[in-house]
């Protein structure tokens, strides 16, 4: 009988990526199979996020529910990982002594040994250190789960914005070697992945070492990923304005695989608030980046992050943010009311903004961006859009769900053999959170590159001399 593993994940796409790697690692090392039923699980892992308010209490509430299961089934292993584990490791040991394993984002590769050790030790096993990029050397080969895949290319952040815990929970910026990133993506492409999303807390700060000792820039990496057979779409998240350099913008001019959609957080449109946040750019500098991007790629759409109610934010500061939103014409956003994160400088800033004012500002901001997003969606009506078919529709299992370049879900009628392929659809209706389309053409009628695996490519160019020594022509 196989052992069962349950992983509950909160937070960003990096956490989702980490959780998938935990599952692969424990399956490869110990044969654990995933389950969604806590009662079935032999190992319960909680991958946490400390960005939002009351993150710690949310963790302890979940652990309390799992303690009930452990009381009934004493052999169950409970583990806590992610950013809250890094921040609150000692506190978790004190308040929840029944937790067996505590690990950070950079030590998840040690999970098999930690779980094994916890089964013989009375005290919780804890490792929340920052061993740089070691975890990627210990993970099993990537396993595709559909036509899209996330690939982490760097970890941590060195910007130390005053409101953010990431540098304290994930460490400073460390980039994976270029060859490792390309090899992982090539492996995924061989398994049918067509779209890759490059991940990092500050992804465009990527500076990956190459085999010859040189450093690969993010712009160079984008072009190299685009050259991999089978990869027809590239996304990346999350980027920072400081590192959004002209060489990256130039990639938008000559690399069609890079989608015409960018998430570029700005947080505020007020220069005064940006200074208090320790954001190293002004609103005008941010708009300058957007102008250059739209010159390189006129149809690009932009999404962003916003924090309202930051300590000291005045009505004028907020109106500056609203002006930026309208000037840039953002398509989407992740927007939140400021919540102080323990251990960050902004947690000590005095704040006398009434809660009702914060809520009203957030509502106004979200309504404005939602209206802009709906306008963009309506402009797509009656147009043809190239979409990647991701799977069955979540609303109607007899239909298919696909995604546009600008990150909109399109539901349409089509056969299951289209899953994992690109198709062209005509947009026939627009809704708040999705579009409806009609199938126009399938991939066989498109002029896409043929997918040739490395094995097939080498077989085509293999030449042997009289001694049987093979050579290959790239």
Swiss-Prot record:
Q: What cofactor does this one take?
A: [4Fe-4S] cluster
Q: Which InterPro entries match?
A: Elp3/MiaA/NifB-like_rSAM, Methylthiotransferase, Methylthiotransferase_CS, Methylthiotransferase_N, Methylthiotransferase_N_sf, MiaB_methiolase, rSAM, rSAM_horseshoe
Q: Where does [4Fe-4S] cluster 2 bind?
A: 157, 161, 164
Question: Signal peptide span per the entry?
Answer: none
State the Pfam families in the record: Radical_SAM, TRAM, UPF0004
Query: Under which EC number(s) is this enzyme classified?
Result: 2.8.4.3
What terms describe the molecular function in GO for this protein? Answer: 4 iron, 4 sulfur cluster binding; metal ion binding; N6-isopentenyladenosine methylthiotransferase activity
Cofactor, how bound (note):
Binds 2 [4Fe-4S] clusters. One cluster is coordinated with 3 cysteines and an exchangeable S-adenosyl-L-methionine.
Q: Which residues form the Radical SAM core domain?
A: 143-375
Is Repeat found in the keyword set?
no
Principal location: cytoplasm
Q: Which residues bind [4Fe-4S] cluster 1?
A: 12, 49, 83
Question: Which residue intervals define the domain MTTase N-terminal in the entry?
Answer: 3-120
From what superkingdom does this record's organism come?
Bacteria
Keyword terms of this UniProt record: 4Fe-4S, Cytoplasm, Iron, Iron-sulfur, Metal-binding, S-adenosyl-L-methionine, Transferase, tRNA processing
Describe, as the record does, how this protein assembles with itself and its partners: Monomer.
Q: What is this protein called?
A: tRNA-2-methylthio-N(6)-dimethylallyladenosine synthase
Organism of derivation? Vibrio parahaemolyticus serotype O3:K6 (strain RIMD 2210633)
Highest lineage ranks of the organism?
A: Bacteria, Pseudomonadati, Pseudomonadota, Gammaproteobacteria, Vibrionales
Gene name per UniProt: miaB
